[in-house]
């Protein structure tokens, strides 16, 4: 129930207008609390942003929205986002050609093609089906309580062959986790597997940046302050780089873990490391695929991890019908001629049509995802409270849009509870 809002009531100050900060703000707004959302950048969204270059929509790194996310879906108007779905499966390059591996439960017509594809063995495909049944039959709460180990150890424990792990899981989940060693938490693997199994990987028709923009539209215009850097915090105020000090009833840090460590040095050692990715954009006269599907490098060679023609999912990513192609390379690769090397490599995948591709932009994303190893410290509350200051973000839950949204919600709930107990 929405409580009465007093215009004179001190606001909750939220530092960081990414997905976690926006989630916190929307829940506080719904409960009738005043808020002030401050971000150092020129727009909301944090890592979930979309730029425009020569009329093309360029997400900051290849990202998808999983429409099975329960908490995020409850906050969004998914119909208004006009979500465009990818095919449930992938094309895997085995060193010679692309082979189709689909979710046969959702694409039964592909059962024979997938079963006979030289990606793992037939027993591996049966094990995928068994794993799917078991994970989809588990609740998220049950998954969160399971023994945690690396994803590689988990997959080996389920009996998957080395060929299946190396050819499919390393490339597909390498693109999700931004690491191909599969050292990511098995709980995170099961969570992600469940979300893919229950729904679809999608893109908002107008870019991933539409997701945070929709959340920001729920807030009063005067509650959001952009292009202002916070340089110090305490439990009741923040100080901007301009010297201005803003007072509030509570302070929430919804920044990435690097900024958390700068503003709260006592937490720096507890913040996770970051995984990085290099994302290249090309435009072309036409798509090399002509279907909305992700292509994976299962060959174990080359630098490319995954490729996707975004315009096959949403033609709105292009201003004029040309194809927009996203290529992900794990890690940071600042070489000037990287795009040339990538095109040369992808000629082995798609043939001579790659010669017609034009390089549009390369993004070096050093802080793409927080580390998610089994040993990564996660607060059971989904957020951290340090010396009276609240800290939220996907680093405190799971490295995903859903994780960020949940963390922001839990901080909001804690602040609302504190306010009610003070009445």
Where are these regions (language model features)?
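Helical element adjacent to the flavin cofactor pocket in flavoenzyme catalytic cores
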Residues: 189-237, 246-249
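N-terminal Rossmann-like FAD-binding beta1-loop-alpha1 element of flavoenzymes
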Residues: 10-37
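Short beta-strand to alpha-helix junction loop
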Residues: 63-70, 143-147, 158, 194-216, ...
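Mobile amphipathic helical/loop "lid" adjacent to a hydrophobic cofactor/ligand pocket
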Residues: 72-73, 77, 82-182, 197-198
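Mid-domain catalytic core of redox enzymes
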Residues: 7-8, 231-340, 344, 348-350
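Glycine-rich active-site loop/strand segments that organize a redox cofactor
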Residues: 48-67, 129-142
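Conserved flavin/dinucleotide-binding core of flavoenzymes
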Residues: 4-5, 315-423
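Glycine-rich FAD pyrophosphate-binding loop
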Residues: 29-53
